[in-house]
Amino acid sequence: MKPIFDINETFEKQLKDLTSNVKSIQDNLLEEIITPNTKTEYLQRFLIDRFDKELFKKNVPIVSYEDIKPYLDRVVNGESSDVISARTITGFLLSSGTSGGAQKMMPWNNKYLDNLTFIYDLRMQVITKHVKGVEEGKGMMFLFTKQESMTPSGLPARVATSSYFKSDYFKNRPSNWYYSYTSPDEVILCPNNTESLYCHLLCGLVQRDEVVRTGSIFASVMVRAIEVLKNSWEELCSNIRSGHLSNWVTDLGCQNSVSLVLGGPRPELADTIEEICNQNSWKGIVKRLWPNTKYIETVVTGSMGQYVPMLNYYCNDLPLVSTTYGSSETTFGINLDPLCKPEDVSYTFMPNMSYFEFIPMDGGDKNDVVDLEDVKLGCTYEPVVTNFAGLYRMRVGDIVLVTGFYNNAPQFKFVRRENVVLSIDSDKTNEEDLFKAVSQAKLVLESSGLDLKDFTSYADTSTFPGHYVVYLEVDTKEGEEKETAQFELDEEALSTCCLVMEESLDNVYKRCRFKDGSIGPLEIRVVRQGTFDSLMDFFISQGASTGQYKTPRCIKSGKALQVLETCVVAKFFSI
């Protein structure tokens, strides 16, 4: 197949070619994927020994991860890749394991990294077009690598970001502004994420005048970095003043590389940073510490949207740029309007990434799956992916809304995860519904001088009737360093939160709750400060990645519930 992307062509022409020829690119891509795979054990049950798009769509079933897991497990345990893929499977990508339960292992090969590198180069061009002067400095990016595991077959299993950072693609990346970071590679590759995060902050502070952008993959990680800064700035200043890294950082790569960045004692710089951090309010702290920062690059769509107010507070309303929509299955596309408001972010799907189909979610026949070029404006769909690593017509589990078109390429807004729900009876509360309800509670908290830091939930069926439990971590409005137990909780406000949350839920919930009596009163359990950091630490200990971590909005793990329950300081009901 002729390459879709010619690095020597202009950016505008590259983008126009991709987005104007969606159908032909998708058809050619599907043929390229399927033709060598018709003899695999999986596909030969459905296809004759040649490519035929109509037969593919008619015979090959739409599947979930559980449907193909037996085939993947065979490769994991040592059988040949051609059980499911004619192209050699060189490893497995781990999902975050926080949205829908246990981690999934997706097959991958270098085609995934080819696509990822393509997207990185494309989004660099997009940002260059929209953000002036961004080429004149470095990025303070909170990027992490997680220790990989090995499958019985000897293939690595790791998260997508680790696969990229440990690859030759990253090692031999272009020497331009977008790949220029304040942190040495050794900090990114450090397997101890606590040490890595501290070193990211230290290197960024030393080079504070060179930073033109900062960020992380997800907004939650950016917020955590700021929280670590709040708790560690005195130690960081001490390191800068002395020119020596703290002894508790034991990773040799970090020790050696960060020492070079420190470059000896810098007492005047330490004094400047200390004066900034010592001020009463941390509003705008990012812009004050890194005055040349032009934008924050991090995902703020979906469940990450709740962190937008906190980032706006700390970053003094710098643009929050959500660049890319991707998953362990594939990279979907990029945001071509990077300076738009977080609530307006849409991603233009790139037709050369994978073969995309869509299950309609607005009623009608869900078997009437449509191609990328046939989606309709204003309709919602679940994407289905066929990729180069052995996934054929696999449901992704996301729900997306068509918001427009760039030439012929559809643009999608991420709406929610399909499989994250609370349910006691006939009620089905998805992540979007829960987020809207919590947003109403957040307004009540703010009127009482409290900020919502994070939340999660679970359906408690140990009582009769069962009821929704929502865990909230709150803080004082100005972010003062106090334990939750040390400032007075407004009992009336929190009881009101229970009521407004119930009022925000749908009619099925209200019928079950107030008419049928099949759901009990909604409960809020307030947890002490630092609880959601502990929850993150738990999931990381179970295999989740620091860089890709998202707070689960519905807890399914009994052990994770124990982490939360040990931190509860108060309970409120909607009675």
From Swiss-Prot:
Belongs to the IAA-amido conjugating enzyme family. It is an enzyme of class 6 (ligase). It comes from Arabidopsis thaliana. This is 4-substituted benzoates-glutamate ligase GH3.12. Disruption phenotype: Enhanced susceptibility to virulent and avirulent bacterial pathogens P.syringae pv. tomato and pv. maculicola ES4326 with or without DC3000(avrPphB, avrRpt2, avrB, avrRpm1, or avrRps4) as well as to the oomycete pathogen Hyaloperonospora parasitica (downy mildew) isolates Emoy2, Hind4, Hiks1, Wela3, Cand5, and Wand1. Impaired hyper-sensitive response (HR) and systemic acquired resistance (SAR). Compromised salicylic acid glucosides (SAG) accumulation. Resistance is partially rescued by SA treatment. Expressed in seedlings, mostly in cotyledons, leaves, hypocotyls and sporadically in roots. Not detected in unchallenged adult plants, except in flowers. The keyword Chaperone does not apply. InterPro entries: GH3, GH3_C, GH3_M. GO terms for biological process: benzoate metabolic process; cellular response to hypoxia; defense response; defense response to bacterium; detection of fungus; plant-type hypersensitive response; positive regulation of plant-type hypersensitive response; regulation of systemic acquired resistance. The gene is GH3.12. Catalyzes the conjugation of specific amino acids (e.g. Glu and possibly His, Lys, and Met) to their preferred acyl substrates (e.g. 4-substituted benzoates), in a magnesium ion- and ATP-dependent manner. Can use 4-substituted benzoates such as 4-aminobenzoate (pABA), 4-fluorobenzoate and 4-hydroxybenzoate (4-HBA), and, to a lesser extent, benzoate, vanillate and trans-cinnamate, but not 2-substituted benzoates and salicylic acid (SA), as conjugating acyl substrates. Involved in both basal and induced resistance in a SA-dependent manner. Residues 6-33 form a coiled coil. Specifically and reversibly inhibited by salicylic acid (SA).
